[in-house]
């Protein structure tokens, strides 16, 4: 059994890790760390685990975690996470970090977009970007995986086949994405209050969202150092979970929609977590709620000569906890599906 610790276990992402790992046949939950809930039983705060998991939350103790864990998930805010990861890395335990602290190779880019000093730049070279569908072999060999952001996951999976085949102009990428409120985290803020969110849609961080730089940097890293310019606009919509990303790109040459669909099927075989939908069927967030799947739909608009790509994920699963578990499975040579075979909740 793989002994697992989760640091930041009371947040939305942390508790989603607990929910999914509770059904993983090769995992033993070793410790759940939460500063705010220390010494309280898990089931006192989250009653859905009554009779399922008999664990109490504990304070962070680096030595104890290293002794009792084969892998640690850090589900903490950026800035805080890097300090914990820096300590844990020195004791040799495997780590999957769900913050943005280790997704970049260049600390200057991180510091520019996150407005936070990076105290462990030497670990940026060791960290592997954890988007399994494009980086599987490197993840297998890694002991520190940077779990991708939710918006970059939906966007990069939608773009990857046409980027890999050099079919699009990288300075024409436009991404319009909608996210449920859980993407804003559990912390209290006015913008997340029910009366602010209900019956309302709004854009935010226009032209300045941190995930813009993550998308651009990953495209550059995995496309032979080609520079991408991405126009990314996120929106908050009144639902709990889900991301729907609509992506617009210009093709370098004429190619049929049928050929594009065949290309996507080649990159994403039917046995994987990415599902390419038939012609004129497009993703909805309802298809993926509670699952680790990403649904992708394609349409070549001949009038504007733009390829429109729509992708849908659950921001807490494929966009966070589920993807982290998929990474863990790869790191331990387990089937990628293990513990992640959930079908979408409907209605």
From Swiss-Prot:
Catalytic activity as recorded in UniProt: N-acetyl-L-glutamate 5-semialdehyde + phosphate + NADP(+) = N-acetyl-L-glutamyl 5-phosphate + NADPH + H(+)
Positions annotated as active site in the UniProt record: 150
Main subcellular location of this protein, as a coarse class: cytoplasm
Keywords: Amino-acid biosynthesis, Arginine biosynthesis, Cytoplasm, NADP, Oxidoreductase
SMART domains: Semialdhyde_dh
Keyword Chaperone in record: no
Compartment(s) where it occurs, according to its Swiss-Prot or TrEMBL record: Cytoplasm
Any one GO molecular-function label of the UniProt entry: NAD binding
One GO biological process term: L-arginine biosynthetic process
UniProt record similarity statement: Belongs to the NAGSA dehydrogenase family. Type 1 subfamily.
This protein's name: N-acetyl-gamma-glutamyl-phosphate reductase
Gene: argC
């Amino acid at each position: 059994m793989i002994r697992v610790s989760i640091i930041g276990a009371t947040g939305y992402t942390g508790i989603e890790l607990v929910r999914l790992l509770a059904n993983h046949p090769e995992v033993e939950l070793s410790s759940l760390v939460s500063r705010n809930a220390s010494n309280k039983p898990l089931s006192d705060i989250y009653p859905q685990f009554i009779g399922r998991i008999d664990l109490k939350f504990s304070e962070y103790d680096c030595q104890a975690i290293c002794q009792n864990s084969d892998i640690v998930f850090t589900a903490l805010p950026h800035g805080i996470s890097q300090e914990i990861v820096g300590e844990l890395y020195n004791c040799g335990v495997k780590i999957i970090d769900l913050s943005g602290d280790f997704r970049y190779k260049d600390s200057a880019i991180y510091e520019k977009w996150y407005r936070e000093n990076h105290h462990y730049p030497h670990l940026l070279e060791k960290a592997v970007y954890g988007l399994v569908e494009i980086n599987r072999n490197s993840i297998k060999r890694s002991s520190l995986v940077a779990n991708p952001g939710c918006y970059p996951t939906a966007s990069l999976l939608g773009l990857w086949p046409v980027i890999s085949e050099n079919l699009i102009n990288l300075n024409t990428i436009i991404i319009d994405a909608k996210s449920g409120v859980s993407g804003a985290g559990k912390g209290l803020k006015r913008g997340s209050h029910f009366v602010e969110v209900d019956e309302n849609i709004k854009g935010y961080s226009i032209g300045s969202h941190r995930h813009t730089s993550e998308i651009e940097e990953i495209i550059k890293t995995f496309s032979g150092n080609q520079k991408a310019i991405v126009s990314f606009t996120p929106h908050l919509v009144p639902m709990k979970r889900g991301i729907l990303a609509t992506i617009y790109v210009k093709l370098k040459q004429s190619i049929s929609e049928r050929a594009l669909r065949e290309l996507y099927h080649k990159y994403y075989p039917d046995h994987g977590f990415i599902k390419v939908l038939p012609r004129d069927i497009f993703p909805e967030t309802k298809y993926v709620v509670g699952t680790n799947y990403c649904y992708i739909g394609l349409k070549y608009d001949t009038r504007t000569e733009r390829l429109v790509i729509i992708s849908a994920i659950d921001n807490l699963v494929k966009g966070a906890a589920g993807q982290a578990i998929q990474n863990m499975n790869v790191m331990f040579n387990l089937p990628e599906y293990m513990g992640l075979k959930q079908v979408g909740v409907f209605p």
